[in-house]
């Protein structure tokens, strides 16, 4: 991974988030989290967690996420609000923190391996 290539960095962050959230929702496939079937509310929630980690925790601008993920600003804002509200419950907050920590550790492994090469 070229640490100066914003596209590669974004993709590495997204991949780390998808894998971490997949581990948090083990009954879902990554493809179902990336593009949730319309009637799958758990897949939609998992996707919202991914967007929340990307924006709130990894610091990607909402505008960039909207463009790259081909989502509307309203969909991204709704995802952020939904997860912010769910974070008020301790059980969900603990689960979210575990997924966030896993995403960070996965991203650290990717960047460490790249720098070592």
Regions found by a protein language model. Give the residues of each.
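General nucleic-acid-binding
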Residues: 1-21, 103, 112-117
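Short, Lys/Arg-enriched anionic-surface-contact patches
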Residues: 23-47
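Short, amphipathic alpha-helical "recognition" segments used to contact nucleic acids or chromatin
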Residues: 43-60
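DNA major-groove recognition helix of helix-turn-helix
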Residues: 55, 79-80, 84-87
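Short alpha-helical "recognition helix" segments of helix-turn-helix
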Residues: 63-72
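Helix-turn-helix DNA-binding helix
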Residues: 75-77
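Short Lys/Arg-enriched helix C-cap and helix-to-coil transition segments
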Residues: 86-106
């Amino acid at each position: 991974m070229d640490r100066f290539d914003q596209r590669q960095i974004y993709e590495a962050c997204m991949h780390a988030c998808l894998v971490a959230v997949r581990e948090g929702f083990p009954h879902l496939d990554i493809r179902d989290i990336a593009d949730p079937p319309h009637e799958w509310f758990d897949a939609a929630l998992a996707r919202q967690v991914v967007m929340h980690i990307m924006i709130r925790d990894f610091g990607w601008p909402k505008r960039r996420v909207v463009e790259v993920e081909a989502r509307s600003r309203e969909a991204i804002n709704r995802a952020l609000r939904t997860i912010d509200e769910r974070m008020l419950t301790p059980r969900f907050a603990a689960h979210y923190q575990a997924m966030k920590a896993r995403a960070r550790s996965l991203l650290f492994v990717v960047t460490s391996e790249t720098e070592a090469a």
